[in-house]
């Protein structure tokens, strides 16, 4: 991260016109692939849109963060569970890329019930000169065939195709909240409210249940699983977080069913801060391993915390994301905003973390310098290549010209989903139905 963390540069933004934006257009997940060349977004309408980095822009410092639409496809359709009389939304909950092994790209996408493996490939040639079919693909009358032709490949305009290669269904009773690809690249896991399943990419009709916290009597249920992720380097290790603010690290070598954790991370509650909302705001909405695998980052309603895998009793770092909302918890409870699930991400070197807030604000915290900055993703101040100015929220007292009052924050505008390029300071921020791409300020 450059020294001036308090200034970022917007390089491009993909905007949909508010006049025709619908609920289906709201972006529900954002994810860079392992090289950062592709950026995938999923929305509430079940669509996946993939953006590709402009090749010419890589060598031009001012344009190195420009992405264009590469492929768009319908990943999930709305369904109906007739046994339970429940509608299954088409909304894309999570997208996860697999490392590229050949010319094609592979990604996982999931809604509440079904995970799909997609292959995204390019085609710039088409076969011609079939003997038994005409150019439109219709069968020819064998009696009209007088010569034997050798089919040839002809150049054509580049076409990007997305095809479903695997469908992993019928394994989750509750809503899927997480998917995570294992470092062995042969397996992945999917987590719902009460269970975590382990899948092999080649087997769609069977999965192994590795965590099950469902009590025999559902009235005894005290917590649910909120997020889960595999360790980036050790294929036997994974973590999952709960609505009680705890994190469990499990080792699949110890037991096939990982109901008994290897490590248990929990911060003791400060009795002086105890309130009616304590349990709600302590629920963890996201958990992420650092790229090094040494740390875990968690996000609850008001804070982002960094945990060392070797210290279970408290986090090594705690960052206040929007502590000024502590006095507003009652109204946030009434309008259901207190249940919003904010995600968090690391930069490529694990030195900076990023997470979202309200009013289309998002926050960055430099772990080394302990400096932080609040930035805004909005149409009004986001012209291409404009410098983003830090924003400040004023709590009571006199408000400066460049500050915004906590009472005037728009809670309908929220940054829940963000992504960071794996090796460069390029970030993607989803603000409702708009996607913004930001890059480092270039002097």
UniProtKB/Swiss-Prot annotation:
User: Phosphoserine occurs at which residues?
Assistant: 275
Residues bearing Phosphothreonine?
Answer: 298
Q: Name one GO molecular function term.
A: protein phosphatase regulator activity
Mark the WD repeats by their residue spans. 22-61, 87-128, 171-209, 220-260, 279-317, 334-375, 410-442
| Tissue expression per record | Expressed in the brain. Isoform 1 and isoform 2 are expressed in the forbrain. Isoform 1 is more strongly expressed than isoform 2 in the olfactory bulb. Isoform 1 and isoform 2 are weakly expressed in the cerebellum. Isoform 1 is expressed in the testis. Isoform 2 expression is undetectable at birth rising to adult level at day 14.
GO biological process annotations for this chain's record? mitochondrial fission; mitochondrial fragmentation involved in apoptotic process; neuron differentiation; positive regulation of neuron apoptotic process; protein targeting to mitochondrion; spermatid development
InterPro entries xrefs: PP2A_PR55, PP2A_PR55_CS, WD40/YVTN_repeat-like_dom_sf, WD40_repeat_dom_sf, WD40_rpt
Name the domain of life.
Eukaryota
List the keywords (alphabetical).
Apoptosis, Cytoplasm, Cytoskeleton, Membrane, Mitochondrion, Mitochondrion outer membrane, Phosphoprotein, Repeat, WD repeat
Q: Modified residue Phosphotyrosine is at which positions? A: 295
One term under GO cellular component: cytoplasm
Gene induction: Up-regulated postnatally and in response to neuronal differentiation.
Q: How does it assemble?
A: PP2A consists of a common heterodimeric core enzyme, composed of a 36 kDa catalytic subunit (subunit C) and a 65 kDa constant regulatory subunit (PR65 or subunit A), that associates with a variety of regulatory subunits. Proteins that associate with the core dimer include three families of regulatory subunits B (the R2/B/PR55/B55, R3/B''/PR72/PR130/PR59 and R5/B'/B56 families), the 48 kDa variable regulatory subunit, viral proteins, and cell signaling molecules. Interacts with IER5 (via N- and C-terminal regions). Interacts with TOMM22.
Q: What does this protein do?
A: The B regulatory subunit might modulate substrate selectivity and catalytic activity, and might also direct the localization of the catalytic enzyme to a particular subcellular compartment. Within the PP2A holoenzyme complex, isoform 2 is required to promote proapoptotic activity. Isoform 2 regulates neuronal survival through the mitochondrial fission and fusion balance.
Q: What is known of its domains?
A: The N-terminal 26 residues of isoform 2 constitute a cryptic mitochondrial matrix import signal with critical basic and hydrophobic residues, that is necessary and sufficient for targeting the PP2A holoenzyme to the outer mitochondrial membrane (OMM) and does not affect holoenzyme formation or catalytic activity. The last WD repeat of isoform 2 constitutes a mitochondrial stop-transfer domain that confers resistance to the unfolding step process required for import and therefore prevents PPP2R2B matrix translocation and signal sequence cleavage.
What family does the database annotate? Belongs to the phosphatase 2A regulatory subunit B family.
- Name-wise, this protein is Serine/threonine-protein phosphatase 2A 55 kDa regulatory subunit B beta isoform
Instruction: Please tell me the species this chain comes from.
Output: Rattus norvegicus (Rat)
